[in-house]
Every structure is written in structure tokens, then in C-alpha cells.
């Protein structure tokens, strides 16, 4: 459980993570780690460490671009994808944003595709994939730079599942 959860201290551009219980269609209650305000390599890895430390049987991450990295953007996004693929504790990573798309293309050209790391072009696609893949008891981390607007994917996920009961 998350009884001992404490958000990471507010330093170095992170610390806005909020943990909450959410309920999707079919009464699927899960834990949301919502940190969709900011993302840089330090805060991204710290958020993933928080996700890894949870006791959930399935850990899912919705990850958007890490913006404003300049010349380091490709290498940082590539390193993140390699980390995600190699993380035995991670069930699923859903990627979105232009930087993630480019890194995903490079990664799959080199290593092939897997069901563990997937790319979705829009927040609506992210919401649909989450609705189809999330299960009771999962922990979902949502993390990305502000410009990716991952809160829209969450709003769509919660709106669609709570209003029609059938998901997207």
C-alpha cells in the first residue's frame, strides 16, 4: 500500500506528485500518482523510483516528453526508454509527445516492439489505452512536461469511464 507514501521534497523542479485513489468502469479502483506538471531527467527517474517502491502487483506509467533538454533531448529520452524496457517491476509504459515519439521510433527500430512500452499519439489514445489495460489494484504514474498536457488524458479517462461505464 501507500500508507507510508510521502511526495518527494519540492526541490530541483519536482515535488508536486499527488497520490489518490480513483475508480474506473467495472469498479476498478487503483492508485494514481499524478505528477503531470513538470518533467526533467532527475524528476522522471525520481517518480519512477517512487512507482517502483509501491507494493502493487502491476505498475503502469503514462509518460510524456521531458522538454527543454536541448542537445541532450535525444540521448535522455533514449536512455529513459532503455530503462523502462529493462525495469522488471514495470508492467506497462505508455508514451506520448513528440520527443517520446522520436525516441520510441529509434528504440523500436533498434530493438523491435514489445507490449511493455507503447506509444500513443494523442491524449485521447492514451486514455483509451489506459481504460483497456488498467486493472483493479494497479498503480498508475502520470508524469510529463506541462506542454504535453497529460491532465487531459486523465480527464478523458475519468470522464469516459464514469459517464458511460464502458470506457472509451
Regions from the PLM with identified roles:
Residues 1-168:
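ATP-dependent carboxylate-amine ligase
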Amino acid at each position: 500500500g501507500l500508507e507510508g507514501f510521502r511526495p518527494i521534497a519540492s526541490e530541483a523542479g519536482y515535488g508536486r506528485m499527488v497520490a489518490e485513489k480513483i475508480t474506473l468502469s467495472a469498479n476498478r479502483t487503483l492508485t494514481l500518482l499524478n505528477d503531470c506538471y513538470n518533467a526533467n531527467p532527475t524528476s522522471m527517474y525520481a517518480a519512477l523510483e517512487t512507482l517502483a517502491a509501491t507494493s502493487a502487483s502491476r505498475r503502469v506509467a503514462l509518460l510524456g516528453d521531458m522538454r527543454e533538454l536541448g542537445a541532450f533531448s535525444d540521448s535522455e529520452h533514449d536512455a529513459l526508454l532503455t530503462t523502462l524496457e529493462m525495469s522488471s517491476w514495470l508492467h506497462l509504459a505508455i508514451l506520448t509527445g513528440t520527443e517520446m515519439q522520436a525516441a520510441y521510433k529509434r528504440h523500436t527500430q533498434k530493438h523491435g516492439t514489445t507490449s511493455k512500452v507503447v506509444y500513443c499519439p494523442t491524449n485521447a489514445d492514451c486514455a483509451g489505452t489506459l481504460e483497456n489495460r488498467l486493472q483493479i489494484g494497479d498503480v498508475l504514474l502520470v508524469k510529463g512536461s506541462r506542454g504535453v498536457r497529460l491532465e487531459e488524458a486523465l480527464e478523458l479517462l475519468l470522464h469516459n469511464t464514469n459517464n458511460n461505464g464502458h470506457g472509451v
